[in-house]
């Protein structure tokens, strides 16, 4: 396993500036071809276990025993995350926990997980595409409204915003407005092996639908919850993890 990653400690300020001014920053060819191939093989194995339907891992042995676990524990990667949080929040993160997610959108069940606009709980979001359709219209592109809001000083404002936007009706209205060109989000066609960084807490984002015959697999690293330690934050995290487990189970059951 090749555990050397392309991280330049001198680029932290540049990355932070691009996240703020452009909405996101892309580190091209972050993974070597060998590393990308290794992760793709892991995804294929997992996809077969879930009968070609949607699944997501929130931490756990599937991630920690893989290259994703190695990356999440790499000192230079953790230093990058801490530096970005400091730049974005003006202070150090409450703790150094890195939440790692492996998400795979595939099959008919995957469409239910598209256009689910949301704000992340963490300030810093790092997206590592593993397998992404590169042709056609339904590629599962990342759509985002960058830096719509600041870091809220009160957790209740954060909860209220999430309640207003992260529900089925609001998401349908946003998706409809985009189709009618009333709203014009940024759109990123993700390239496997590149690394994408943005202010997830401040950016309303989702993925577009993915062709059921294709697979969209991404690793996501979350760092720095501005409201860490609050009861509301703990409840939101538990609800999100429960929802992900339920979506995985439903996708597998419906394929049987």
Question: Residues of each region from the PLM?
Answer:
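A short hydrophobic beta-strand segment most commonly corresponding to one strand
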Residues: 213-228
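Catalytic core of non-heme Fe(II) oxygenases with the double-stranded beta-helix
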Residues: 106-195
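A short coil-to-beta-strand element that immediately follows conserved catalytic motifs
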Residues: 87-100, 140
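Histidine-centered active-site/metal-ligand motif
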Residues: 118, 205, 222
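Short beta-strand His + acidic residue motifs that chelate non-heme Fe in jelly-roll/DSBH
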Residues: 203-211
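N-terminal auxiliary "cap/dimerization" subdomain that precedes the catalytic jelly-roll/cupin core
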Residues: 1-79, 83, 194-195, 227-256
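Short, glycine/charge-rich beta-strand/loop segments that flank catalytic centers
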Residues: 58-64, 95-104
